[in-house]
Amino acid sequence: MCDVLMQPVRTPRPSTNLRSKPLRPTGDGGVFPRLGRLIVRRPWVVIAFWVALAGLLAPTVPSLDAISQRHPVAILPSDAPVLVSTRQMTAAFREAGLQSVAVVVLSDAKGLGAADERSYKELVDALRRDTRDVVMLQDFVTTPPLRELMTSKDNQAWILPVGLPGDLGSTQSKQAYARVADIVEHQVAGSTLTANLTGPAATVADLNLTGQRDRSRIEFAITILLLVILLIIYGNPITMVLPLITIGMSVVVAQRLVAIAGLAGLGIANQSIIFMSGMMVGAGTDYAVFLISRYHDYLRQGADSDQAVKKALTSIGKVIAASAATVAITFLGMVFTQLGILKTVGPMLGISVAVVFFAAVTLLPALMVLTGRRGWIAPRRDLTRRFWRSSGVHIVRRPKTHLLASALVLVILAGCAGLARYNYDDRKTLPASVESSIGYAALDKHFPSNLIIPEYLFIQSSTDLRTPKALADLEQMVQRVSQVPGVAMVRGITRPAGRSLEQARTSWQAGEVGSKLDEGSKQIAVHTGDIDKLAGGANLMASKLGDVRAQVNRAISTVGGLIDALAYLQDLLGGNRVLGELEGAEKLIGSMRALGDTIDADASFVANNTEWASPVLGALDSSPMCTADPACASARTELQRLVTARDDGTLAKISELARQLQATRAVQTLAATVSGLRGALATVIRAMGSLGMSSPGGVRSKINLVNKGVNDLADGSRQLAEGVQLLVDQVKKMGFGLGEASAFLLAMKDTATTPAMAGFYIPPELLSYATGESVKAETMPSEYRDLLGGLNVDQLKKVAAAFISPDGHSIRYLIQTDLNPFSTAAMDQIDAITAAARGAQPNTALADAKVSVVGLPVVLKDTRDYSDHDLRLIIAMTVCIVLLILIVLLRAIVAPLYLIGSVIVSYLAALGIGVIVFQFLLGQEMHWSIPGLTFVILVAVGADYNMLLISRLREEAVLGVRSGVIRTVASTGGVITAAGLIMAASMYGLVFASLGSVVQGAFVLGTGLLLDTFLVRTVTVPAIAVLVGQANWWLPSSWRPATWWPLGRRRGRAQRTKRKPLLPKEEEEQSPPDDDDLIGLWLHDGLRL
């Protein structure tokens, strides 16, 4: 078989009724002529090289699927604001599992019962044992307060959030999710519960799994479409198979090379692999069509197969190289974008296009050499040239009409692109039958849409925020946030239940003061009679003390007589010194009886008139004025001794002495009388010593001092009575004022209920209880417990731990909204929340704080922001690259400008059709990745067709633009149509994917390619070229150096004009290209089918 293939065969000559021009010799210089000669001499070596390369890479390099699992693509760059804030919040609160969360939905349509709860607890226990894959678990077994939150209102479903290690979409997270899914399935099997896994981690897993399942189906669909189209174009099964063999080999090699790039750190997304397959098939088939069409042209000119292969490769290889370079450079430029899916798909597609290009200029010619020698890929008669020539004539005759009609269609369709609404919810790209979609449906059925998607207002400060002022400022900030439209509730340390803590409002605290004042006012009113009694009692006391003063003055003279008598007795007996001399004192008996009578009378009077001493002493004891006055204090001491003498029997002993003196009789023996008096007198002397009366002079002075103190007390009591009366009058007035104050404060409590009117204050002592580590409920003062609003200490500590970081420098608030967290409205709300929070910062304790919002809506918002930025970058970069290549190729300015404009309008029109089909007809929003990705591909591929069309027009316009347009449309129409159909078929093959984003992108790409093929390149651009005329090739003189032409040698004027203006039709159709003319080598009549 090999020998047969190696034998040269003679290719059939064209029809004899067609005159042909002799072929010019092909130049030997350049890469492609040398490459053509090598391939013709050694086709088996080239084929063996590709087979060996594929055979070497396939077993030694991991598959692209495996690499995509190891190196997944992160949606956002690592320095995205939301990711930075999330990491900071996670570090501040020492949490894990916030980046990647899966939600287990456990449901029972009959209602949750005891058996369901046992299954729930068993599942929780199993998950807690898996410490490698579960870093966070929010269950109501260990945290009973979560039961209400985690249970649906219809009591038919529970949710169980599970935090996984690693970032969302990372290899670690994916592997952990797979193992957690196995645990859930195993534990719930056989129970009455139905378990569904959903949440962000489940969505990412389903995206990857669905992409892998779709790939084989997509590749099969693309292959079938290509076979049909190639069979229609060539009508030859062998010719049809050659491009497929080339593409298949290049796909194997390209995937392994991309896998090597993945091992070097390039992220690989399953969606990117799908687009990579479609792009390789489309571009590879286009290049094969270019080469085979030029090969057929040379065969028609009488060349044998080997010569045709060399000439076709020499001429069209440069076109393929320029086209591939344009596409590859454009794709590689996407590495400067920010979003992961765009940043990684660019290098993947760039590598793929490069591999396809090398296969198209090496492997495909080698296959053509072997099959062409046997005549297996001979051309058939061209059936389309007459149609395209007629089309060119119509355009030249009525360029304005054609331009207006085509432009009107394009502009109307492009206008629809401005009505696009973009979707950032990856849930909608998944089919409804996957696990995560079923779980989301269960969530939507039983729970609010925003329940499992937390959104936080995160505040970071360089100072400790656990102060009354900082908390008051925080409350004012979140109060503003709570007023943002769509915000349903804000929960945090200052508002645990979603509204400002009532007991911390200053209006509530003022109301409590008012309540106490009201109670005091009522007490004053109730005890007004008692106050009046106080005033009367003070006046009565003052009157009585006046009477006491009179009694004291009278008693003082009597006491003085008693003291004189006792002093006389002491002098008479001589005290202890004269005890032995009493035997000679009988003569004194009479005097003693008389003295006894006097002592008895005076002692009795004193004893009967000391009743005034007790109240006076009590008044003096309670008088601060007497305590401060040394004289009054001394008198008080003496008066205390007098009262003590009365109470302890001293005065009674004096009376006993008097009675003994009175009982002296003549018949009594002196010894007995004196013996009795001796004992009584000794007792009296000791008692008087205790009273400080051992010295008669001292007693007299002290009695006088008491007299003075009593006088002063009587005078002060009157002043006291007047002061008490004044106090009573003031208390009555204060009671009236307290009533008015309490009424005002209570009214403030009742009416100042809005946060703006209420104020906020939490005592620092309460903060220390909330953030302390060893606080017990019984140690907290009752006034602080009153401020908790029904929370106990443990609950307060949990609230503080949830919303205040351990160091106090970070605080967060949980935001609940009425919006779908995946919607664009929720993304737009982020800016409003941030603006409201930052607007409350100036001139507060939060002035230097960093305020950010964390949550899925913020992730989607950042995705949108980066997408908009990347789209602008892609547009600018792609336009510049393609424009530069066109300027270099055409050596002109005007034509490249309107060509770029046509590309952009074509892209917008394709996007507009996508909006009409998906948004208006199917009710689906366009996926956010569609604009950027489709722009690059449509503009880059459109650049191929631009090169084919405008380069040939530049060549044919030597004899006039109008005739050049006719010849260009006639010669390139079939090639552009075939290439466009093949590329569109490759893109439409992606419509068989299950991912909505891939389906939308494929439809827009396929539609855009068809628009570009059948409208823009064949009607709009030729019409513009006719209207612009020779100005198409205008170039500033400074850009025209004599030898300037980087892609090849320029011809002189004589060479450009030596071709006859008119040729017979047959000769014109069969005339070969000038071998030394670069433009002719690129796009001459031989490029037709």
From Swiss-Prot:
Signal peptide: none
Native organism taxonomy: Bacteria, Bacillati, Actinomycetota, Actinomycetes, Mycobacteriales
Gene3D superfamilies: Multidrug efflux transporter AcrB transmembrane domain
Miscellaneous comment text of the record: Was identified as a high-confidence drug target.
Compartmental location: Cell inner membrane
Protein name, as recorded: Sulfolipid-1 exporter MmpL8
Example of a GO cellular component annotation carried by this entry: cytosol
GO biological process, one term: cell wall organization
UniProt entry keywords in alphabetical sequence: Cell inner membrane, Cell membrane, Cell wall biogenesis/degradation, Lipid transport, Membrane, Transmembrane, Transmembrane helix, Transport
Pfam families assigned to the protein according to its UniProt record, in alphabetical order: MMPL
Bilayer disposition of the protein: Multi-pass membrane protein
Keyword Cell wall biogenesis/degradation: yes
Keyword Membrane: yes
Expression induction or repression: Up-regulated by the PhoP/PhoR two-component system.
Function: Required for the biosynthesis and the transport across the inner membrane of sulfolipid-1 (SL-1), which is a major cell wall lipid of pathogenic mycobacteria. Could also transport SL1278 (2-palmitoyl-3-(C43)-phthioceranyl-alpha, alpha'-D-trehalose-2'-sulfate), which is the precursor of SL-1. Required for virulence.
Disruption phenotype: Cells show attenuated virulence in murine survival studies although initial replication rates and containment of this replication in the lung and spleen are identical to the wild-type. Inactivation of the mmpL8 gene interrupts the normal biosynthesis of SL-1 and leads to the accumulation of the precursor SL1278.
PANTHER family: MEMBRANE PROTEIN MJ1562-RELATED, MEMBRANE PROTEIN YDGH-RELATED
